[in-house]
Design a protein with these regions (language model features):
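Substrate-binding/access-modulating region of protease and related hydrolase catalytic domains
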Residues: 252-359, 363, 416-434, 489-490
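Autoinhibitory propeptides
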Residues: 4, 40, 66-148
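Loop/turn elements at helix/coil->beta-strand transitions in domains of secreted/extracellular proteins
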Residues: 72, 105, 169-173, 243-248, ...
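C-terminal subdomain of the subtilisin-like protease fold in secreted/lumenal serine endopeptidases
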Residues: 34-44, 77, 276-284, 446-506
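Active-site core segment of subtilase-fold serine proteases
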Residues: 142-244, 266, 273-300, 325-340, ...
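Short glycine-/aliphatic-rich beta-strand segments at the starts of folded cytosolic domains
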Residues: 45-55
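Secretory targeting and sorting signals
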Residues: 1-35
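Extracellular S/T/G-rich loop segment that most often corresponds to the catalytic His/Ser-adjacent loop
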Residues: 343-441, 498-505
């Protein structure tokens, strides 16, 4: 078996009747939104690029560098002085080289390889939404929400038993840094935190009403993730892992579906400064799947997002991220990356994943989540790696590979969709919110716990899971991935599969 390679790793969408090998990647596209029009106005010149300039620590350094930006042919869009990151637009092809020579600049680089767009339209791949008949047919057990019987993933992490003890605290907020969240959904509205929600697509916060929502033709990915985390236990639809906590939407994906550095930096800083306890990051930062430290542009992107994620953790947030969907061994000596840069013309390259990092997934302090299917083994697509994958949780898999027990019918993960609907998706994008939900339950149980303590409890309470050996998920007689490590910690499952019951009882 070979792993499917989706253009957008963070947004694998699998219609319920399709095998993983033919999975559709989300292409969240639409015309430019109001938030993007500001960016377009700055970038009327089609050759303009966006940059991040990372300033060395020091009194007055940021002000000095901002003046130098103008002299180098750039325009400051916004500046995050608290972490020393400046977002710049420039049409000068030598801008990065020039600004790197300025005293006080640690690193600088283009956040993309394609010019800033003025407007974009394209097609959209969608998940399979449940029909009205399917919703009506679902039979719930006493005390369950109507669609909960289809959620095999909840008992897989003992969330159903956890809910008998605690639903989580409304004082805890999980931020979904993603494609936007439809807060009008009946399963999301009761738990939505508007004050911690924002649109960061341009790299600058847009707090206008509803700016955090996906457009009508944009990806439902973020809404799906939000429901997995905190869909209310309210007699409607489905139930989230932590149905008593708050969830916010931080939109960082542009109309083309790209998660650029300036938007991701904005998202982490916003979360840091608005009381967020957990961030969920089911994406990788475009346009490079791996950002190499020996490339000046990629190093700048790595520096900027590292500063932002560390700032969020310093302010009290646990950062959780999806491991990725290419069946890569992230602990291997080398990986062949055929997809970067994904916003222009990709070229095949061989990278060392210890020096070229998937961000934010491989950043220090980030909880990296691998995916399991309905049989509790590694999903066919899930990235893995000893010392890289920290923990595992249900992200689904092709029903042909891992079929759930009745009454559940799909091996994929049920979630909320915009417009008051529910539907299935699969990917490490779906595994990560399960862990974010468990982290929120731990924070609810231990309200004064630091991010370090929450992570320590998350790992200690995970159910140790031994390597699946040999791993031949499609039963073709060929090994599809090799798991290294012990039962207590290995490359497929990290410290184990997340445990929601322990999160509320220990």
């Amino acid at each position: 078996m070979t792993a499917p390679h989706a253009r957008y790793r963070r947004a694998v969408a699998i219609p319920a009747g399709m095998a993983m090998a033919t999975a559709l990647a989300f292409l969240p596209n639409t015309t430019a939104t109001a938030a993007d029009e500001a960016t377009a106005a700055v970038s009327a010149d089609a050759t303009s690029l966006s940059y991040v300039v990372n300033v060395k620590p020091g009194h007055g350094t940021s002000a000095y560098v901002k003046k130098a930006v103008g002299k180098a042919g750039g325009t400051v869009v916004t500046s995050y002085d608290q972490i020393g990151v400046i977002v710049v637009h420039s049409s000068d092809p030598d801008f990065a080289k020039t600004i790197r020579k300025v005293r006080g600049v640690q690193s600088a680089g283009a956040t993309r390889t394609a010019p800033l767009p003025t407007a974009v339209t394209a097609d959209l791949g969608t998940p399979k939404a449940l029909s009205a008949a399917e919703v009506a047919k679902a039979e719930a057990a006493p005390g369950q929400d109507p669609l909960e019987s289809l959620q095999w993933d909840l008992p897989a992490i003992k969330a159903d038993k956890a809910h008998e003890k605690s639903l989580g605290s409304e004082k805890v907020t999980v931020a979904v840094i993603d494609t936007g969240v439809d807060d009008t959904h009946p399963d999301i509205a009761p738990n939505f935190d508007r004050g911690a929600s924002v649109n960061c697509v341009s790299g600058k916060p847009d707090t206008s009403d509803g700016a955090w929502r996906p457009g009508a033709s944009e990806s439902p990915h973020g809404t799906h993730v939000a429901g997995e985390i905190a869909a209310a236990k309210n007699g409607v639809g489905m139930t989230g892992v932590a149905p008593g906590v708050k969830v916010s939407g931080i939109k960082v994906s542009n109309p083309d579906g790209f998660f650029y550095t300036e938007a991701v930096v904005c998202g982490f800083v916003w979360a840091a400064e608005h009381g967020v306890d957990v961030t969920n990051n089911s994406y990788y930062t475009d346009p490079w799947y791996f950002n190499c430290k020996n490339d000046p542009d990629q190093k700048a992107l790595l520096d900027a997002v590292t500063r932002a994620s560390r700032y969020a953790e310093k302010k009290g947030a646990v950062n959780v991220a999806a491991a990725g969907n290419e069946n890569y061994d992230l602990a291997a000596d080398e990986i062949t990356d055929p997809s970067s840069p994904n916003d222009s013309t990709p070229g095949e390259r061989v990278v060392d994943p210890s020096k070229c990092l998937d961000i934010p997934t491989q950043l220090p302090g980030v909880v990296t989540v691998a995916s399991t299917g309905a049989k509790g083994i590694k999903s066919s697509f899930s990235n893995y790696g000893l010392g890289v994958a920290d923990i595992a949780a249900p992200g689904g898999d092709s029903t042909a590979y891992q079929k759930p027990e009745p009454p559940a019918t799909s091996g994929l993960i049920l979630g909320t969709l915009p417009g008051g609907k529910w539907g299935y998706m699969a990917g490490t994008s779906m595994a990560s919110p399960h862990v974010a939900g468990v982290a929120a339950l731990i924070k609810s149980t231990h309200p004064y716990a630091s991010p370090a303590l929450v992570k320590a409890l998350l790992y200690a309470e995970a159910d140790a899971t031994p390597c699946t050996d040999p791993y031949d998920i499609d039963a073709d007689g060929k090994v599809d991935a090799v798991c290294e490590g012990s039962k207590n910690r290995n490359g497929f499952y990290g410290w184990g599969i997340a445990d929601a019951l322990d999160a509320v009882t220990k």
